[in-house]
């Protein structure tokens, strides 16, 4: 009865033709339900032959109906047994049953006959199947519980909402009490089929109830529903989320009829939940007993109690399968490693996982050590079981590995066979020399604050210390993250430069004095008395360019080295910020020509004084225009403009020639237009 599908098309009654004396036969096609009869997957509409005595005075070829309005009269199945009262009219039927009930009841009678034939076939196949105990599968055992289990009722529900109620033929139970939903008790062994919508008002506790109230529910979960599909003789899609109720006898039949080809690797545990009332005074309380009847679970035993749609089904609360409880076995990820290598790796990880001893700091304390303690002799030679101090990484207190853990792992210099004794001795010497040089930070950074400009080239300085400093220490300093600079002082000597002549030394001293003076004064203003002025009466001082200082060449016959020019440029940059830039006064028109000549003409060389008090011939080379003719034209234009302005002023005294010039700027607008 699995995967049955009702259709909206029903067959109407057909005329009954009289074949012989006193009996008539009518063939009615049943299309209210499509059944897959067999394993070939074909949908068949099986006609049913009805036999009944013809109604008297019924003309031939006229449709025969009953007085109830279009319903067939009471008919009997020729090949099946109809329970008494099954065809009588009912007043409590639902709307779907009252509509065209004649054809529907006829189809239901035929389906009951098919069910009985299918279960008979199942009994024959169960006897032909091999014993499951030979395959290593446990047979379900029958559980006996206290109580008067004189009879039981089976309720089976498929995926489309069809419930099948049956009464075991071997149990002496009052079948009339269990068939109260139908008018008339069914015969023994006959299945009652009705849609579950008609029985929605019934409680869910009706499944497998004993007369004394004992309820036995067997839940088939997962792929075990395939057995029920095979039992009905039809192949349908798996619907493991449905509840199938069965008596204990049905469980025994399941054990007899189960086959490995239907169970396979998808077989799961079968559970039976039995709820029995207590025999004592506490009759209202119930105790649930759950016992695993069959252990046929395999690798998919963890999916017990879940259907394909994820609906939970009552079953055992925990998996008792030994396969599910076995521990996962670890596989070797690196097959190249031998057991000895793996043991070494385990030892190293175990040593690293151990923390420092209690009360001992995991991080080294650098506050109490000097700047040279990072490269002490102890880091290489004094500790036999340790590593050099500069190799140790400071670990935090939050769970890192301490240097003691590294020492406990057996790491030492003997683990590096590539180093020879001579190389180790060189390493010790380099570390010792570096530690001696790093005792004082003042030897690394020169103190420029207390050293004057005269101490730049003295005897104790860069060259002497550079000659004494070993080359290997520079590379060692780079490896330790420090700046590779030579430990030097702030003093040097001119004797270290034998190529310099007396003139070069004189130039150096002069440049040194100029630089020192410029640094001391900075950007202070110098008195304008030292500036050169043209004797042009009321004119302002000419503007002096910041870069108008001419290079000082003491002796043109002597060669000058390139570094002297660099010193001269530095001096010029320092001096150019000390000159005052006087502004040109252009308040009067008569000074325009003079100012223009001073800016654009060729001024004569003038004597001036620099910031050091020396007299020099200053020529502002940058202020001289490269086009003198254009400059003269501009100067003449300025003079002509001044003369024209004077003429206009004299003509406008009476305001007759140009009347608008006597007005203000606003009054001039519109005058003379």
Curated annotation (Swiss-Prot):
Compositional bias segments (type: Polar residues): 171-183, 193-216, 234-246, 268-277
Keyword Phosphoprotein attributed: no
Bias (Basic and acidic residues): 288-303, 520-534, 638-673
Amino acid composition bias (Low complexity), ranges on this chain: 278-287
Region (Disordered): 36-73, 171-216, 229-409, 478-497, 520-552, 585-673
Keyword Translocase: no
Top-level taxon of origin: Bacteria
Coiled coil: none
UniProt keyword list: Crown gall tumor, Plasmid
Miscellaneous comment text of the record: The Ti plasmid contains at least six transcriptional units, designated vir loci, which are essential for efficient crown-gall tumorigenesis.
Protein's name according to its UniProt entry: Protein VirD3
Source organism: Agrobacterium fabrum (strain C58 / ATCC 33970) (Agrobacterium tumefaciens (strain C58))
